[in-house]
């Protein structure tokens, strides 16, 4: 936080989501003050109103804030992609970031942490990438570039900006595992396509711990891969998840079937992957609680996610 010896004030946009709610709980557990940035009428003094579509936000409300964390964004796999939904994916990320970045710059907030994704790197195949690698190609890679680019006003103002390029977050109650578990429980879990595409993952516990680490470590800035240290192929993930819940995983879902069911999202989000590693986090001394996919899945499937 701003200083380890005093309570920090952290404002969070997107605090009702899986990551945001877990981060808010962890901050409060460490006796820090959390301000939730909400669209509705604030229920108490710890909520700040905004309307990102209209640009409405009271900059004065964050002049005494130590860090602003922006986790806004519609879920990529929420529905089959259409032109309008792809625009929604962009608008739900870029517009809030533009509003908050300008507000942070005007208010002089010292730290701005903005969500991004490892999709920034495009399809890396089996090539290992870290924060020094260039952006890839495709819709998601361009989306991430534009999303990160929306933080420029804060960067130009001298704010310490963290671009939190997150992988697949593993948690019990929400996220991808909660959607996959019913299929795997009936032995219907399957590798996707040839299963050789890489998946960069992180447990929810380590995701939150990494965000707390980024807030408190002033030496960190720029892109930060929030992923576990050992990315795995889709086939390896499928086997590990089946093992974690004691179910066989003998099936394979052909690429053509995935494309038929999910359209463009299949080629952008499931049939390609990123082999991203958390080089910047590890250089800064961050230590993961879950270093392997087996450890992360065992944790996420045998106990409630907590921090």
Swiss-Prot record:
Pfam families: DUF1731, Epimerase. The lineage of its organism: Bacteria, Bacillati, Actinomycetota, Actinomycetes, Mycobacteriales. InterPro entries: DUF1731, Epimerase_deHydtase, NAD(P)-bd_dom_sf, SDR39U1. Gene3D superfamilies: NAD(P)-binding Rossmann-like Domain. This is Epimerase family protein ML0860. CDD domains: SDR_a8. Belongs to the NAD(P)-dependent epimerase/dehydratase family. SDR39U1 subfamily.
